[in-house]
Curated annotation (Swiss-Prot):
Protein task: Sodium-dependent and purine-selective. Exhibits the transport characteristics of the nucleoside transport system cif or N1 subtype (N1/cif) (selective for purine nucleosides and uridine). Accepts purine, analogs of purine nucleosides and uridine, and exhibits high affinity for adenosine. May contribute to regulate the transport of organic compounds in testes across the blood-testis-barrier.
Species of origin: Rattus norvegicus (Rat)
Gene Ontology molecular functions: neurotransmitter transmembrane transporter activity; nucleoside transmembrane transporter activity; nucleoside:sodium symporter activity; purine nucleobase transmembrane transporter activity; purine nucleoside transmembrane transporter activity; pyrimidine- and adenosine-specific:sodium symporter activity; uridine transmembrane transporter activity
Positions of the UniProt region annotated as Disordered: 1-22
A Pfam family the protein falls into: Nucleos_tra2_N
Family: Belongs to the concentrative nucleoside transporter (CNT) (TC 2.A.41) family.
Protein localization: Membrane; Apicolateral cell membrane
Protein's recorded name: Sodium/nucleoside cotransporter 2
UniProt keyword list: Cell membrane, Membrane, Phosphoprotein, Transmembrane, Transmembrane helix, Transport
Gene name of this polypeptide: Slc28a2
Tissue-by-tissue expression: Expressed in liver (in bile canalicular membrane vesicles (CMV) but not in sinusoidal vesicles), jejunum, spleen and heart. Also expressed in brain and skeletal muscle. Not expressed in kidney, muscle and lung.
Amino acid sequence: MAKSEGRKSASQDTSENGMENPGLELMEVGNLEQGKTLEEVTQGHSLKDGLGHSSLWRRILQPFTKARSFYQRHAGLFKKILLGLLCLAYAAYLLAACILNFRRALALFVITCLVIFILACHFLKKFFAKKSIRCLKPLKNTRLRLWLKRVFMGAAVVGLILWLALDTAQRPEQLISFAGICMFILILFACSKHHSAVSWRTVFWGLGLQFVFGILVIRTEPGFNAFQWLGDQIQIFLAYTVEGSSFVFGDTLVQSVFAFQSLPIIIFFGCVMSILYYLGLVQWVIQKIAWFLQITMGTTAAETLAVAGNIFVGMTEAPLLIRPYLADMTLSEIHAVMTGGFATIAGTVLGAFISFGIDASSLISASVMAAPCALALSKLVYPEVEESKFKSKEGVKLPRGEERNILEAASNGATDAIALVANVAANLIAFLAVLAFINSTLSWLGEMVDIHGLTFQVICSYVLRPMVFMMGVQWADCPLVAEIVGVKFFINEFVAYQQLSQYKNKRLSGVEEWINGEKQWISVKAEIIATFSLCGFANLTSIGITLGGLTSMVPQRKSDLCKLVVRALFTGACVSFISACMAGILYVPRGAETDCVSFLNTNFTNRTYETYVCCRELFQSTLLNGTNMPSFSGPWQDKESSLRNLAKCCDLYTSTVCA
């Protein structure tokens, strides 16, 4: 009876589910008779099939699984082997490139050396830092440290005196630049906020580091060649901007219009700096420079990081590196941060100045030399009298970029630079127009009392001439250099560098030095001194930029910022002037003198600086004896080509011997 009911229910369920196959119905009934449901049967068959397939796949994948586990156990060894093979391949490539043409491979060789140096520093710090600290423990002895300081300071003073005595014996005019440094130091000390609190260790260390670095990059042949090469590479690198500018604006505009020639360089350089910041390279370099300045000069971590950062970023971007610490900084530290901003230029505008034709190596040298000098003079003008919270370098950390990948960093850098380009263009338009208005007004006022040609530049040339002379500029060049220094301080450094580039272009194009009693260009030494003296944001318009940037970061310290900004402005300007004095002390003429006899014997038709110099030499060697046939002295004597060369020079330049 139960079985018949079971069959009936099974048939009903099957008919309800739409199953009309009798074979399936009989199988289902048989299984149900054994007390098993349909689901249990199905699951049993599926499990058997799954186990079979799983076992098969395990057997197939077993070699790959073993290989993966073997690699995971020896992953470190495999990475080292792969890295070693790549290093060997790169070393072979570098060796082949250097053997074929070392000059062509010099850039790659220098980059490789820098990478090796960075890796070596990381290795030494990781494995030998504690041992080095233990070795330096004896120096913590107060008496020993005092004697070491005295010996070192005495040796430095004696070395400086001997060097000045021997070096200035050949070029006594360099003593004028040394007197200029002393003059600026005395003026700043007289303006010091706390005379008795001045840390002379910081002052002398800062000036000493600036002087040593100046010797390396200006006086020594390897250092000069290295920075000259670096400047050339930067110029080549910045020239790639033309590709993008020409595509967007066209070749004609890029070649002839300043806005399309120089300003796009700021965008390109801003993009590159953003990439380097994303990779952490900028932070690494800033930290190393700040660490060195801190251990030598005894400054605190926050202010040192900000001043070191000013070598690469602008006066409003550098405080962002230490933004979390600005509220707790002392007045002396804030003064140092502001002075560093006024005393240096940003890496982004460095490219724009180079595009003007300004010497790249001088700009780079001036930017780096300004950092220790800015800290030194800042502590001279506003010494530390409070207790700082940032005496240990561990208390300050540099932030990393917020970008998630390198493409985002490049895009953000280019986009952010647009505001800087607009700012530069707007300032140039406004200040050149203001300068033209001021000159027109002064000229109108001067003509009222029969003073002709009175301009703002003329006033600066008289007022600032003694100061420029103390930097080491020859007296004949002082009026023009004083003009551009005045324009830089009262107007803008872009306008000043543009005027300096005009003087340089006139010299290189062979324009006569004097036309109608007015000097047209300045000497090479004066150009270098002027480049150093202009290398900074210390001008009156930068006061508003600095206050606006810092006030937005720490609005609660607005009164402190307003109290310090003018003092920091003049301190930053003096940093550039002392750097110019250093350049005046260390400058020596470079390059072999031109053999004018051989040079003029070539077919010259265009005016160049060498042509002008050689023609001047020929004019001075020409003697008029009251006859139509002049005679010649010096290297031009008894040369058949002298008369022919004299005629060519007279076609290009005017002289009394050409009459």
